[in-house]
């Protein structure tokens, strides 16, 4: 981590009652050590999760050509950064690979050796990485999602062989003003481009 720059995008509190907690976290970030540099980007107004992530990822990936993203409540393995950077290096020229994640929907498997990688249709919003050229396709409007309404085979594939109802999440994103997920739109972007994570 000592060669890695850390950027923390701290959203403003949604409710005034939470402002002290947000400030406490911001002060804590100021004590974080072990990185080449720690930058705290303080939002003056509440962006909400989707806007904060989208704008933060866009800023960093456009500046550095790649980005590793973590949610704020994770504890990583000591090899996490190496794994993610190795994945970014290994698959950079494989344009069908749209991102890297250390998460898998598979059960814990002991029959994979330490050099194995699995390419799936989706990763997770918890921790992931991508490149600027892949992120440039991010479709905030989720254009073409209507095909999922009528094409059951397409919807089944989008739903990971109906193991999880991603379609419902995307439908809520498009039809419900309360739902505002960057992650389902990123998955849709990658899915319709036949991308793997």
What are the functions of these language-model segments?
Residues 1-69, 74-197:
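An acidic/histidine-cluster motif and surrounding catalytic segment
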